[in-house]
Amino acid sequence: MSPLWWGFLLSCLGCKILPGAQGQFPRVCMTVDSLVNKECCPRLGAESANVCGSQQGRGQCTEVRADTRPWSGPYILRNQDDRELWPRKFFHRTCKCTGNFAGYNCGDCKFGWTGPNCERKKPPVIRQNIHSLSPQEREQFLGALDLAKKRVHPDYVITTQHWLGLLGPNGTQPQFANCSVYDFFVWLHYYSVRDTLLGPGRPYRAIDFSHQGPAFVTWHRYHLLCLERDLQRLIGNESFALPYWNFATGRNECDVCTDQLFGAARPDDPTLISRNSRFSSWETVCDSLDDYNHLVTLCNGTYEGLLRRNQMGRNSMKLPTLKDIRDCLSLQKFDNPPFFQNSTFSFRNALEGFDKADGTLDSQVMSLHNLVHSFLNGTNALPHSAANDPIFVVLHSFTDAIFDEWMKRFNPPADAWPQELAPIGHNRMYNMVPFFPPVTNEELFLTSDQLGYSYAIDLPVSVEETPGWPTTLLVVMGTLVALVGLFVLLAFLQYRRLRKGYTPLMETHLSSKRYTEEA
């Protein structure tokens, strides 16, 4: 019997299985009453009547709005997946916060705001290159990740069964699990890409709510924002910011795979992390997708083995280059039909890595984001497991920095994002799965400064904006040649004019036209 099967019978170190509900929801809403009534509108504070902070004007309990516009792409089923019309399979009513208030009970502020009434603009946190961090900043970041792997999430839980098993076998035991802060981060990513469960051994794989479409950029942006806020609260530092890894080195080595950062390779088994790294003991969750499909169940947070990277045999593979970043940032269209992995001249598809960096489609080539995941290999190679590796955090922080730079350069209107006929989950107004309370793609289609953070980074400008030396030299040489040609032409015309003045009278053709007459 595989370790996973045993795991369904035992509690795990990071996630303790409890009676609960399915989906990623606040622990306080995981009661039979809340699930039967399909309402998650918790009170704020001790006063039972203060639902959603209504007594302070922070919010109200309202009907969930879900996008019903048509989608395209390979997912052709209807009413078969609990993520359709998210989150209405679970809750019809949730807190709708007003102004700058946010959170499942409107007890938080929107990203970028602070104060008792969320009335003050918060100074943006600055995401820096991980190689530029001071030793103290580096230790704070790595230590926060390690603490997040061990500390149970204070507010949210994960599901252990699909939607038809929501209340357990007897209808009175909602199925959910407590989980560590970091494993919760991993589970969110897994849940967004998992297969549709149709029956034992009958997965429907043509579905992905966070990749292969426009939502790739907004989904991962919100994913990072949630982790960043969780880590800020975990270590008690509101100015803490996630760093980024500038992977555009063009090299065939991972410069963050060191014991000072995310761990070097173990000498006796290069697929494992060096014992000198704190991450050598990290175990993965949500890695056994085929087993979940066979059992018709969900990842329950059970640990399934050590974190792995495997660059062996990939010495010929190189990371993206600065030219790739420049080419990608020169693409002016955010996305193009069919808004999928075969879209061409799409900034989103080039950044995600299904197009070449210049926007042309080549099914044999990976670029940018996809290339880096493939380069790292191991746990990082598959979407459902990739977030287990903490490199995922800094990889996606840099990907978001590229997206943010594009947003600043082109300032796209909201309708640059398709309102309909993107793959399921990728329409502009779709609630991103499985975030709760609901948040649409459109709400994250902003520049980072509007969300309370920014990047300390200088990304390469396009060739059109700043010509390189070869281009500049060609322009100068061309101008000189043109000037010389013009000088020769003028000299020749002057020579002909002078010659004409000495033509003998016998060859002169007289004209009766006066100078004052029109030609």
Curated annotation (Swiss-Prot):
> Which regions face the Cytoplasmic side of the membrane?
494-519
**Cellular component GO terms held in the UniProt record:** cytosol; intracellular membrane-bounded organelle; melanosome; melanosome membrane; membrane; plasma membrane
GO BP, one example? cell development
Query: What are the names of the required cofactors?
Result: Zn(2+)
- Where found, per UniProt? Melanosome membrane; Melanosome
**Highest taxon of the source?**
Eukaryota
Q: What is this protein called?
A: L-dopachrome tautomerase
Report the source organism. Homo sapiens (Human)
